[in-house]
């Protein structure tokens, strides 16, 4: 088979998947447990079936396709990525890795190759954390790090919990722990991914091999102050939560630069309470 045929099929699959967005023409918005996510999941299932995989969707919404190996008892080789996105995100973020994993399985099938151990293609649900502010939901469930209490705790900006969103999506959150894989059952994991930074593009390099991976920590900080009238409260009598928060925020990027070891930092969300233009904020979250 010519490489052009393979890359052409991958491109065709990606072009099809990118249509499942809530913001056509303005980047990809495919939040977890939505209509767009369901459409993408079903399309991935169809591709996996065509590639000869045994297909299922687990209790966390992960789409999983298995090619049985000569010795299924061995820890599997897993390959894939996520199928959700941020708001107005890149068209191929995540789905490139899922589609490439399925193509690997297809090539094994077409060439009559049976792997030594199971090969598993996966599309993870809610890696980004855009809707509920958490992230790694599907992969976390596979590791046994998600339970019913977790699903009830986290909510989106409309007050919908992961628990209720899963029920609307057709999943049973009471069975979330069923998504856990036995310890040691995954031997290797591979992910093909778009470059999300500017380095390879700026250096005109087509591909890079990752030798380490980013460890992400997320925090929600709440600064407490006191609400006052913005027009009549003197500056020296204010307890302005925003004033205090911005002083901290301005230092965060400086701390990352001072480390000079590749550490990065981002404050991507700021919210004030009560949020009025003429009211000194009593709370500021970032």
List each language-model region with its residue ranges.
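A non-catalytic alpha/beta surface segment that caps or lines the substrate-entry region
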Residues: 22-68
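N-terminal capping segment at the start of a domain
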Residues: 1-34, 174
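Midchain, well-structured core segments that form catalytic/ion-binding scaffolds
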Residues: 127, 131-286
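Short acidic, glycine/proline-rich loop/turn micro-motifs
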Residues: 28, 89-91, 232-235
């Amino acid at each position: 088979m010519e490489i052009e045929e393979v890359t052409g099929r991958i491109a065709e699959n990606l072009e099809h998947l990118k249509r499942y967005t809530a913001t056509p023409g303005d980047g990809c918005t495919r939040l977890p447990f939505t209509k767009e996510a369901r459409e993408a999941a079903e399309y991935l299932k169809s591709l996996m079936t065509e590639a000869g995989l045994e297909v299922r969707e687990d209790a966390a919404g992960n789409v999983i396709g298995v090619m049985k190996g000569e010795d299924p008892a061995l820890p599997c080789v897993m390959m894939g990525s996520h199928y959700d996105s941020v708001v107005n995100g890149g068209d191929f973020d995540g789905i490139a890795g899922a589609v490439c994993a399925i193509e690997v399985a297809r090539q094994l099938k077409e060439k009559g190759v049976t792997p030594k151990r199971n090969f598993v293609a996966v599309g993870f649900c809610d890696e980004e954390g855009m809707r509920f502010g958490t992230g790694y939901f599907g992969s976390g469930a596979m590791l046994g790090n998600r339970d019913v209490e977790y699903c009830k705790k986290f909510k989106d900006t409309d007050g919908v919990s992961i628990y209720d969103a899963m029920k609307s999506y057709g999943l049973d959150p009471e069975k979330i722990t069923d998504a856990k894989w036995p310890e040691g059952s995954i031997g290797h994991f591979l992910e093909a991914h778009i470059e999300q930074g500017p380095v390879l593009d700026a250096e005109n390099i087509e591909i890079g091999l990752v030798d380490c991976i980013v460890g992400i920590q997320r925090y929600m900080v709440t600064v407490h102050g006191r609400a006052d009238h913005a027009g009549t409260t003197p500056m020296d009598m204010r307890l302005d939560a925003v004033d205090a928060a911005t002083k901290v925020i301005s230092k965060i990027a400086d701390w990352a630069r001072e480390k000079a070891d590749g550490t990065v930092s981002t404050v991507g969300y700021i919210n004030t309470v009560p949020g009025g233009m003429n009211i000194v904020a009593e709370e500021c979250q970032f």
